[in-house]
Amino acid sequence: MGTVLEPHELQEPDGAAVEAFAGRAFGDVAGTMATVMCAVGDKLGLFTALDAGGPATAAELAARADVDERYALEWLRGLASAGYVEQAPDGRFALPPAHAAVLAREGGVMFLGGGYQELAGMLPLLGRLGEAFRHGGGIPQSAYDDDAYDGMARLTSAWFDHHLLGRWLPLLPDLEARLDAGASWADVGCGAGRAVIRLAEAYPRSTFVGYDAFPEQVERARRAAAAAGVGDRVRFETVDGAHGIPGTYDVVSTFDVVHDAADPGALVAGIRRALNDDGTYLLLEMNCADDPSANVGPLATVFYGFSLLYCMTTSLAHGGAGLGTCGCPAPVVRRLGEAAGFGSVRELPIDDVFNRFYELRV
């Protein structure tokens, strides 16, 4: 039975303030509709067809993408109204190059197609999320479909394809030299294995293993490694890092994993035990403020939304800490590291909008 609230006098709102906020809220609804249309365009290859073939009428785009012309026209008009595509007087629609970099060109640093796919895979679980609000608990990883996980991998791929090797590891030249010579690396919470595969391609003398608690993700990673041709120095296993990590390693990494963990303290302690005495733990976490009240603006809104839809709820589904996407700022990282026995917790200056990167040493 819910708490009975004491009646109180409702304040009469300022009319101008109501109108201003209503405009803002309606703008968010419009953005949601644009996101839905983008998710459809990403799934059906409409953006790539428009980008690759150039300006097109609805009939031409429908032929390129093998979709119904009437649906193509409504989609084009909808995204033209949002300013995502441009419409010419002759009835053709175009995707400007700057927009194509975000919407059509897979693998680019600014590409957002994976985010649209991930969100489309999570929204069908809103009913279960409401039940968790009412009764506690959460949504387990097994409840999410391929769109959620494939989208997640696509959204974060730029971090590993561009930043990990090109910007982040160069901040640790001694570690790069060690990897060149041959070292052992375990990535805990490896997901679809993108980071491990890129590392194996760059450092053929080193060996890499990816661990994930979710068997379906491990299978995705194995398929990706086979396709990349790095199976001779990469393996993936189903392991919950909080319950212990097999073997010892020169490097252990977690890439935006600790805030998802049911037991973050046990996870970081398990990583400490799995490190050689001269080893390095590389910890990537979301770029959030130390004070939760300072997490404001569009980026924080996206973080909290994904936290409700996945990060926090999957932890709570296992009776976990439920830190959430913004629950692992620098003070929490330092506290977890020190409690696990790390003598040095150093934040590296990666200057990244989404992430903060830490080096932990014994």
Regions found by a protein language model. Give the residues of each.
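N-terminal leader segment of winged-helix/HTH proteins
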Residues: 1-36
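A short acidic, leucine-rich amphipathic alpha-helix
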Residues: 58-64
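A short glycine-rich, Lys/Arg-flanked "PGG" loop and its adjoining helix->strand segment in the class I
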Residues: 265-277
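C-terminal alpha-helical "lid/dimerization" subdomain adjacent to the S-adenosyl-L-methionine
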Residues: 284-339
